[in-house]
C-alpha cells in the first residue's frame, strides 16, 4: 500500500494540478479531499490544455478512478458543465466517483457569498463568490444538504423548503435581500442530481478497498496551506482545510494510510485576493514575474499578486502539513533577472522572527529580511537534472531546500509534462 498527498505550500496556484497529473500516471486512484469549484488547475494532456475546477486531475486516465471526497463542496450544475465540456472534447468521465456525503452548493449559497462580500466593504475577504464559504457554514450548522439528500426527491424537497425559510429570514435581516425561490432551484438541481446519480457512492469504501488491495492512491489538494482556515492568514483564507491532515476527514480514511506528503510551491510567491503578503513586489521585477509567469487566476481571471520566495511561509507549511518532499515549479520564470531574493525571516517591531505570526496586525507590521543571490540568463526550459541547470539556478534551489529543511524531489522548468523532472522515487 502506498499513498501520496499533494498540497500547495503557499496561497494556491502553485501548479498542484500539473504535479498531481504527473504523479497520477503511476496511481490507481486519485482523490480530492477539500474545497470546491473555487479551486482551479490547468492540465496539459495529449497536447491539449484543460482547466478544471471540481473534477480531479485523474479524470484523464480511463483505467484510474477519479474521486470527489466528502470534504469537497459540490455545485452540481457547475460540475455537470465541467463534465459536459470534457465529454465534448472526447474525454470520458465514466471513471468519476462522488461521495454521497459531500455537501451540495445551492443558489442561495452563491447569493449569500455575494451579499456577505458586499456587506464587508473595504474589509472583504476577496472570495471567488462560488458559494463555498456559505456551504461550509451550513455544514457546520447541520442544515447542509448532501449528495445523498439531493438524489432523494422527497428528502431534497423537504430540506430545501426548510432551508429557504431560514435563509429568507437571514437575508432580510442581514442584507435586506430575499433568498432565491424554491421554484427557481428545485427542478434544475434535482435534475442535475439525477444526471450525477451514476457517479455517487460511498467513496470511503472505494478508498478502503484500494488500500486493502495495496493499490496506489494519490490525494489531490486544493488551494494552499496559507489559505487554510486554521493555519493560514486568517481571516483571509478559504473555508476549508487544505492541509494534508484533512485527507483523513475529507475522504474518510485513517491517518495511517498516508505515506508521503508532497508540498508544491513556485520558485517565487503569488496570491489572489486580499490579505497580508510580506514579500509582495510592486516594481519591474514583479511585472516580469507576473507577465512571464502568466499570473492570472484560473477561476477568476484576476491578476495575481506576486513576490519573492518566502521561506518563513514554507517552513510553516512544512510543519503543519508534515511535508516530506518539495516540488518547485516555474523556476524558468525567474530567468533574466539580475538578482533573485529569498525571504529568510521577518523583522517585527525591531526584532527578527523566523516563524509565521498568527496575529494579523503583527503580520502587517512584518518586514521581510532578504538574502540576495545572483540570477541567471541561460534558457533552462530544456534542463532535466539539477546538474544541467546553471550554477546560479541550482544554488538558488539548494538554498531554498536548506532554509526549509525539506528535500527537493521534483522541479519544473515549464508548463509541459516533459518539463517536470523527478529527482527522487516517490511511489
From Swiss-Prot:
It is found in: Cytoplasm. Its main location: cytoplasm. One of its GO terms (cellular component) is cytoplasm. GTP binds at residues 12-18, 40-42, 304, 330-332, 412-414. Mg(2+) binds at residues 13, 40. It is an enzyme of class 6 (ligase). It catalyses: IMP + L-aspartate + GTP = N(6)-(1,2-dicarboxyethyl)-AMP + GDP + phosphate + 2 H(+). The active site is at 13 (proton acceptor), 41 (proton donor). GO terms for molecular function: adenylosuccinate synthase activity; GTP binding; magnesium ion binding. Pathway: Purine metabolism; AMP biosynthesis via de novo pathway; AMP from IMP: step 1/2. Keywords: Cytoplasm, GTP-binding, Ligase, Magnesium, Metal-binding, Nucleotide-binding, Purine biosynthesis. It comes from the Bacteria. InterPro entries: Adenylosuccin_syn_GTP-bd, Adenylosuccin_syn_Lys_AS, Adenylosuccinate_synth_dom1, Adenylosuccinate_synth_dom2, Adenylosuccinate_synth_dom3, Adenylosuccinate_synthetase, P-loop_NTPase. Transmembrane segments: none annotated. Its cofactor is Mg(2+). IMP binds at residues 13-16, 38-41, 128, 142, 223, 238, 302. Its EC number is 6.3.4.4. Plays an important role in the de novo pathway of purine nucleotide biosynthesis. Catalyzes the first committed step in the biosynthesis of AMP from IMP. Belongs to the adenylosuccinate synthetase family. HAMAP family: Adenylosucc_synth. This is Adenylosuccinate synthetase. It comes from Staphylococcus haemolyticus (strain JCSC1435).
Amino acid at each position: 500500500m502506498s499513498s501520496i498527498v499533494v498540497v500547495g505550500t503557499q496561497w494556491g496556484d502553485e501548479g498542484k494540478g500539473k504535479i498531481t497529473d504527473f504523479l497520477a500516471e503511476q496511481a490507481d486512484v486519485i482523490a480530492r479531499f477539500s474545497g470546491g469549484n473555487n479551486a482551479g488547475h490547468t492540465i496539459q494532456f495529449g497536447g491539449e490544455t484543460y482547466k478544471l475546477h471540481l473534477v480531479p486531475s485523474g479524470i484523464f486516465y480511463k483505467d484510474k478512478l477519479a474521486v470527489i471526497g466528502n470534504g469537497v463542496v459540490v455545485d452540481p450544475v457547475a460540475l455537470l458543465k465541467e463534465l459536459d465540456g470534457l465529454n465534448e472534447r472526447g474525454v470520458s468521465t465514466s471513471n468519476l466517483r462522488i461521495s454521497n456525503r459531500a455537501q451540495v452548493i445551492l443558489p442561495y449559497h452563491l447569493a449569500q457569498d455575494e451579499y456577505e462580500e458586499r456587506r464587508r466593504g473595504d474589509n472583504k475577504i476577496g472570495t471567488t463568490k462560488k458559494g463555498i464559504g456559505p456551504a461550509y457554514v451550513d455544514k457546520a450548522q447541520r442544515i447542509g444538504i448532501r449528495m445523498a439528500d439531493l438524489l432523494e426527491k422527497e428528502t431534497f424537497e423537504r430540506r430545501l423548503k426548510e432551508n429557504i425559510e431560514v435563509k429568507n429570514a437571514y437575508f432580510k435581516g442581514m442584507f435586506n435581500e430575499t433568498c432565491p425561490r424554491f421554484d427557481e432551484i428545485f427542478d434544475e438541481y434535482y435534475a442535475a442530481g439525477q444526471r450525477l446519480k451514476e457517479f455517487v457512492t460511498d467513496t470511503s469504501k472505494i478508498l478502503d478497498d484500494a488500500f486493502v488491495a495495496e493499490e496506489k492512491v494519490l490525494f489531490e489538494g486544493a488551494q494552499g496551506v496559507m489559505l487554510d482556515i486554521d493555519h493560514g492568514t486568517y481571516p483571509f483564507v478559504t473555508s476549508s482545510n487544505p492541509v494534508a491532515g484533512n485527507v483523513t476527514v475529507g475522504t474518510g480514511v485513517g491517518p495511517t494510510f498516508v505515506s508521503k506528503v508532497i508540498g508544491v510551491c513556485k520558485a517565487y510567491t503569488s496570491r489572489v485576493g486580499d490579505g497580508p503578503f510580506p514579500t509582495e513586489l510592486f516594481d519591474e521585477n514583479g511585472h516580469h514575474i507576473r507577465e512571464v509567469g502568466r499570473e492570472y487566476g484560473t477561476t477568476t481571471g484576476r491578476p495575481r499578486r506576486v513576490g519573492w520566495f518566502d521561506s518563513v511561509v514554507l517552513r510553516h507549511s512544512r510543519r503543519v502539513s508534515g511535508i516530506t518532499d518539495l516540488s518547485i515549479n516555474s523556476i524558468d520564470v525567474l530567468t533574466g533577472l539580475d538578482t533573485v531574493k529569498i525571504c529568510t525571516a521577518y523583522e517585527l517591531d525591531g526584532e527578527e522572527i523566523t516563524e509565521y505570526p498568527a496575529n494579523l496586525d503583527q503580520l502587517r507590521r512584518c518586514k521581510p529580511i532578504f538574502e540576495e543571490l545572483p540570477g541567471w540568463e541561460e534558457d533552462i526550459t530544456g534542463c532535466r537534472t539539477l546538474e544541467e541547470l546553471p550554477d546560479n539556478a541550482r544554488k538558488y534551489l539548494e538554498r531554498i531546500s536548506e532554509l526549509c529543511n525539506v528535500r527537493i524531489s521534483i522541479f519544473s522548468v515549464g508548463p509541459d509534462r516533459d518539463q517536470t523532472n523527478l529527482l527522487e522515487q516517490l511511489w
